[in-house]
Amino acid sequence: MSRYHTFTAADAVEYARQFGQVADPQALVTADEIGDGNLNLVFKIRDTAGISRVIVKQALPYVRCVGESWPLTLDRARIEAETLLTHSQFCPQHTVKVLHHDAELAVMVQEDLSDHHIWRHELIQGNYYPQAAEQLGEYLAQTLFHTSDFYQSAQAKKAAVSRYTNPELCQITEDLFFTDPYIDHERNNFDPVLLPEVLSLRQDKALKLAVASLKHRFLSQAEALLHGDIHSGSIFVADGRLKTIDAEFGFYGPIGFDIGTALGNLLLNYCGLPGLAGPRDAAAGREQRLKDVQTVWQTFAARFLALSQEKTQDPALATEGYATQFLQHVWRDAIGYCGSELIRRTIGLAHVADLDSIDDEEMRRACQRHALSLGRALILVAPHVDDVGGVVARIRQSPSSLTPQRC
């Protein structure tokens, strides 16, 4: 009989006392539930002084806002904990620390990050963390290289692909990224004023062919252990520090997906800034987002290439020039997935505050239109791009009219 039961606040406190690795466990006395609680219960465990000491996170067996008609596997809690532990093995400085997890209870205890801030909120507020983009690039390089065929043996990699198979959560990604935005689906959510743009996307054969290719690669290319949901809301930042959280969508997939999702969230902020700040601050912020895009990719590519030269195990993959060739393929994937993120976050089920929190209705719509046009352009140009500088230059010069020619 399963030991699973939904935690109360009291359960969370008691669990943290047992497994929170604090020196004074009996000082843990209260639990505050945080987050939207639709997929998980997340508790901040506080001590007698009211200080948050650890986090207890438990997966729910269904989407709470819908009910038991939308069940979800509890195994995602194991996958999340093991993904974070694996990523922490190779990049501990940028991965939240997992203190304990129990697969049967679908629960995890992790370090408290109250001294950090959600990166999306900071980007919206105009607060700049100069090392964040470089640190994100480092995280992506370390985690994706060390879980790829460049580093793992074929036997270990195949076993890991099986262990991290995550069909239910991958199905969510497959639908929300690659299917729903391009059909009339009840999950889609957009301002009716945007219907002409939405219909144009649905009727664009070249775009839909490109999206089909991106989806096929997502379904079939088990290149590395992805975070699977690496947006600016799953990244915490502080002065000189960055930590990733929420890896329940982890699975072995195309490396460019994680990179593209991360870049897409920087560009969502880029699109929203004219509605979030005054003209001068918006212009400066947008220029910084483009620099951040360059920094993330350049840091990732340089570190991945250096790691490949130092640590590649397979003699064929160690052939001079192959890693550079492989990174070209990753870059083109990343640009396509970046465009997919822009579109699905604008008209699909799950939106972002970078656009939706804009108070002025007309400005919000203009920013949303920009995100849609930029997303479409990136998807179409992706097979033809060679470097990040060329793409950034085109976005800067003519942000709504990228054309699919070699950059």
Curated annotation (Swiss-Prot):
Positions in coiled-coil regions: none
Keywords for this protein: Amino-acid biosynthesis, ATP-binding, Kinase, Methionine biosynthesis, Nucleotide-binding, Transferase
The enzyme's E.C. designation: 2.7.1.100
Gene3D superfamilies: 3.90.1200.10, Phosphorylase Kinase, domain 1
Matching InterPro entries: Aminoglycoside_PTrfase, Kinase-like_dom_sf, Methylthioribose_kinase
Binding locations of ATP: 40, 57, 111-113, 246-248
Pfam families (alphabetical): APH
Highest taxon above the source species: Bacteria
Enzyme category, top tier: transferase
UniProt GO BP: L-methionine salvage from methylthioadenosine
UniProt pathway: Amino-acid biosynthesis; L-methionine biosynthesis via salvage pathway; S-methyl-5-thio-alpha-D-ribose 1-phosphate from S-methyl-5'-thioadenosine (hydrolase route): step 2/2
Catalytic reaction equation(s): 5-(methylsulfanyl)-D-ribose + ATP = 5-(methylsulfanyl)-alpha-D-ribose 1-phosphate + ADP + H(+)
Chain sites annotated for binding substrate: 229, 344
GO molecular function, one term: ATP binding
Cleaved signal peptide residues: none
Subunit structure, as described in the record: Homodimer.
Protein family according to the UniProt entry: Belongs to the methylthioribose kinase family.
Annotated function: Catalyzes the phosphorylation of methylthioribose into methylthioribose-1-phosphate.
Record-given protein name: Methylthioribose kinase
Organism: Yersinia pseudotuberculosis serotype IB (strain PB1/+)
